[in-house]
Amino acid sequence: MAIELVTKFKGYVDEQFSTESKKSMLTNQDFDWTGAHTVKIYKATTAEMNDYDREGTGSNWSRYGKVQGINATTEEMTLTKDRSFTVATDALDADETQGVLGSASVLARQNREVVIPEVDAYTYGVMCADAGNKPAAVALTEENIYAEILKGNEALDDAEAPETDRVLVLKPSTYTLLKKCPDVVMETDIGNELRLKGVIGLLDGCKVLKIPANRLPADFGFMIAHPCATVAPTKLESFVVHHNPPGISGYLLEGRVCYDAFVLDNKAKAIYYQAQPAT
């Protein structure tokens, strides 16, 4: 007697793991690109201090010292990343896969697994490349990692970067080294608001973020940054669903994201990037 065994399909999708963006902890939105593709900001110089010539015996006509000029130059930020995607889903496929290929599911998956990781990786790459403090590459170990982090914070102190809201970025492997370091006492009693943003602790006054290695440069060791240094605008983020467009029975999904990241010249010293030797 032949018996046909039942096969069941569940409305569950084996989704890929993906991490939410932590970019907002490291960057700012201080400038508005609405109605413009390029934003220019001014950089101004200052004057040196002099000893006041109270007796008027100096060679300058002014007792205040030699009159100096002030220069004002511009810093230009032009958006360069204009990215897009398009995908079609058949009407029957959407109906017969228990919603797995529904337009809302497809767009959410694309944004979560492709768009956000790309924007993050680009932004972190710009920050590392344009950091104002980039010492020679060092092989990080559990014995030296804490000392290297202290050097980074010291560099930001010497650059007079703001002491509050600094962020220490680690990839999982360097975070493991840090946890093994006997000198480290990380403060983990932090508020729920910071935890929801991805902060896992506080170290030497820095909020500690752990970011997947695939969103960071290959030689990444760690980075200390203040959000004032990097502007990361997203000028356009458009996702459109067309129902039964010409030539397709189903849905045509289109997305476009225009974004970029810029490290400000006078604030680059608020980023310390420690690379590791290439392996």
Predicted regions and their residues:
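Sequence/fold signature of self-assembling virion shell proteins
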Residues: 2-25, 30-50, 73-81, 181-279
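Residues immediately flanking
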Residues: 44, 91, 172
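Short Gly/aromatic-enriched secondary-structure transition segments
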Residues: 54-62
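Long, hydrophobic/aromatic-enriched structural stretches that serve as scaffold segments
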Residues: 67-104
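Alpha-helical scaffold segments that mediate packing/assembly in large oligomeric complexes
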Residues: 91-159, 273-279
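Extended, solvent-exposed, turn-rich assembly/linker loops in the middle of proteins
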Residues: 129-200
